[in-house]
Amino acid sequence: WFAFNSGSEILDHAMSGMICHGNDPCGEISYFGPWKQSCELLDGVFLAVRLNTIANTGLRFDPRFDFHFYDVDFCRTARSLGLRLGTWPIALTHQSGGSFDDEWRSSHAEYLAKWGD
């Protein structure tokens, strides 16, 4: 989310997908542009990868990122291996509002140290 926040508005044209937030599994759905789209980054609320892709490429989660930035790092690693990313219409509820706490800031610094941007 933070990657597409211009400070006053979310750049909807750069986003894809949908999700429910909160404790109610049938809550209000937030839409972020069309789904079934190619993407550069995916939110880690739900990531799916073919087993043969992992076996053939060595794609792995970096253990430096145990909660924050594991998803962004995983996606960038996948893209650096020439893999494609995309969204698909799957219904789920994310029961976390997220936070920008000290742990997030520490992981962000680690992410910047690895990727440089």
Which ranges hold each PLM region?
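Short, flexible, basic/aromatic active-site loop/helix in glycosyltransferases
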Residues: 5-40, 52
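A structural signal for well-ordered alpha-helical scaffolds and beta->alpha junctions
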Residues: 7-8, 12, 42, 71, ...
